[in-house]
Amino acid sequence: MAERKKRSSIQTNKPNKKPMKKKPFQLNHLPGLSEDLKTMRKLRFVVNDPYATDYSSSEEEERSQRRKRYVCEIDLPFAQAATQAESESSYCQESNNNGVSKTKISACSKKVLRSKASPVVGRSSTTVSKPVGVRQRKWGKWAAEIRHPITKVRTWLGTYETLEQAADAYATKKLEFDALAAATSAASSVLSNESGSMISASGSSIDLDKKLVDSTLDQQAGESKKASFDFDFADLQIPEMGCFIDDSFIPNACELDFLLTEENNNQMLDDYCGIDDLDIIGLECDGPSELPDYDFSDVEIDLGLIGTTIDKYAFVDHIATTTPTPLNIACP
């Protein structure tokens, strides 16, 4: 404990070291500058550190002091003054080097120059430029191939010993394909022109046909209208209706005047007149008729009951009492 107190007392007796402020670089103090270059502008940069915290007195002594705010000032000349200074400095350098100017090369340009100057490792210094459509095999021979301009398919030309032979084969085949492509393009253009002319001619002929058909239809319609309206209805013959009135509408019709004759006049007005007193044509009582002649007075029905014959009207009561359902008997 005593040692710690001694150390703390020693540390408190040490004087506080203040940070040294760097003076900004000023061109005003440089000798040999004109008055235009001495007119400077000041740039001030202020940076705040949000993570800087306040420490106690003991911690400030042990640790490096950390400021929350940094201020930096830079003096810069104006643009015209800067260009003038560069020209003056270049003139001074040329005069010092006996008229030989030194060019400043940037770092990027230096790298580019170095890359161009250094040879590529693993490749021969003498590189051969290969023509189009020619490539070298692994065993040293040269292969040539070309793409067909119409079908867009690769055509194999062959394998050759030298590069010149493969290039000549490619060139000859290319000339042939170029001529073929030109011929096909010319033929297609001619066909397109002919088709366009044919289409235009067919369209014009169709238009003419339509116009002719429309004109003929209009003429026929006009003639039919004139014929229908020019008809003279005065020349139309109307038949007389008297012939239809004189004829009898009902065939085989008989007159009913016989009912109102003088002979039967008193009978119609009699209160005790019967059907027998009327004379109906075609239904005489004494004469023959088309209806069948039946006499039901002597009819006896044998019902098979105990072998005896019953009264001719008693079977109706017997049927009503014995049979639950009616009999379907067809009448003559």
Swiss-Prot record:
<keyword id="KW-0804">Transcription</keyword>
<feature type="DNA-binding region" description="AP2/ERF">
    <location>
        <begin position="130"/>
        <end position="187"/>
    </location>
</feature>
<comment type="function">
    <text>Probably acts as a transcriptional activator. Binds to the GCC-box pathogenesis-related promoter element. May be involved in the regulation of gene expression by stress factors and by components of stress signal transduction pathways.</text>
</comment>
<protein>
    <recommendedName>
        <fullName>Ethylene-responsive transcription factor ERF119</fullName>
    </recommendedName>
</protein>
<dbReference type="Pfam" id="PF00847">
    <property type="entry name" value="AP2"/>
</dbReference>
<dbReference type="InterPro" id="IPR016177">
    <property type="entry name" value="DNA-bd_dom_sf"/>
</dbReference>
<dbReference type="InterPro" id="IPR050913">
    <property type="entry name" value="AP2/ERF_ERF_subfamily"/>
</dbReference>
<keyword id="KW-0936">Ethylene signaling pathway</keyword>
<dbReference type="GO" id="GO:0003677">
    <property type="term" value="F:DNA binding"/>
</dbReference>
<dbReference type="GO" id="GO:0003700">
    <property type="term" value="F:DNA-binding transcription factor activity"/>
</dbReference>
<dbReference type="InterPro" id="IPR001471">
    <property type="entry name" value="AP2/ERF_dom"/>
</dbReference>
<dbReference type="GO" id="GO:0009873">
    <property type="term" value="P:ethylene-activated signaling pathway"/>
</dbReference>
<comment type="similarity">
    <text>Belongs to the AP2/ERF transcription factor family. ERF subfamily.</text>
</comment>
<keyword id="KW-0238">DNA-binding</keyword>
<keyword id="KW-0010">Activator</keyword>
<feature type="compositionally biased region" description="Basic residues">
    <location>
        <begin position="15"/>
        <end position="24"/>
    </location>
</feature>
<keyword id="KW-0805">Transcription regulation</keyword>
<feature type="region of interest" description="Disordered">
    <location>
        <begin position="1"/>
        <end position="33"/>
    </location>
</feature>
<dbReference type="InterPro" id="IPR036955">
    <property type="entry name" value="AP2/ERF_dom_sf"/>
</dbReference>
<dbReference type="GO" id="GO:0005634">
    <property type="term" value="C:nucleus"/>
</dbReference>
<keyword id="KW-0539">Nucleus</keyword>
